[in-house]
Each structure stands twice: as C-alpha cells, then as structure tokens.
C-alpha cells in the first residue's frame, strides 16, 4: 500500500486564501463572530485612547486572537455536526454545547481581563 500522497502540495498563498475565506464566511454568517469583531474594535480603540502598556497590549492581543480562533473552531464543529446528521442526536447536541461552552468560558476570561486592564484607566478619569 502506497502511503505517499499523490496530490500536488497546495501553494502557501492558496492556503492563506482558504483561511481568509473561512474568516470572511464566519463574519458574514455568524452573529457571534460579528459581535466579537465589533467588541474587538471597541477594545482596540480604548487601548489606543488609554495608551495602555506593552504588557497590557500583549494580553489584549492574545485575548482578541484567542477569541476569534475559538469562535472559528466552534463554528467549524457546528458545521461538521450539521454535515454528519440532520436528525436530532444527543451526542450532536453535546458536541455543539461543549464547543459553545468553551467559547463562553473564554469570553468570560476576556471580559475579566478587560476589566482588570481598563477599570483603573476609567476610574482615573473621574
């Protein structure tokens, strides 16, 4: 049995194009992805406004990147489950609920980090 892949490797630029297409699809079709996007823009504007530190920037960028990545994974899991079965199945529900739960946990962490970073700046204004 030949284990070598006979297909031509996909050029790097094509891989990048597929990834961008996935992100754009999620932004167009997923309400929560749009909410995360708008929230991220607001957070970035606040970050510039308050001139946060380099360390705070690292946390903000990791939180934003992680949120987008996790939402994309959640969306992919939902799509695969929908592809596998159109009928209700408790395991399909669990898979979707688990993925959504992971996003919720990370979103709560993101909010907590946002409060820790921005609350002192906001309180300093008053």
Predicted features by range, described:
Residues 2-73, 88-90, 102-126:
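Hydrophobic alpha-helical transmembrane segments
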Residues 79-91:
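Amphipathic, hydrophobic secondary-structure cores in small proteins
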Residues 94-97, 103:
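Divalent-cation-assisted or electrostatically stabilized phosphate/pyrophosphate-binding catalytic cores
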């Amino acid at each position: 049995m030949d284990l070598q892949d006979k297909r031509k490797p996909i050029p790097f630029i094509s891989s990048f194009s597929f990834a961008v297409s996935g992100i754009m699809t999620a932004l167009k079709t997923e309400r929560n992805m749009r909410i995360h996007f708008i929230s991220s823009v607001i957070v970035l504007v606040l970050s510039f406004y308050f001139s946060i530190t380099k360390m705070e920037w690292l946390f903000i960028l990791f939180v934003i990147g992680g949120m987008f990545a996790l939402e994309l994974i959640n969306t992919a899991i939902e799509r695969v489950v929908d592809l596998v079965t159109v009928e209700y199945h408790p395991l399909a529900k669990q898979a979707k609920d688990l993925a959504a739960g992971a996003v919720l946990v990370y979103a709560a962490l993101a909010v907590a980090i946002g409060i820790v970073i921005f609350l002192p700046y906001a309180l300093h204004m008053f």
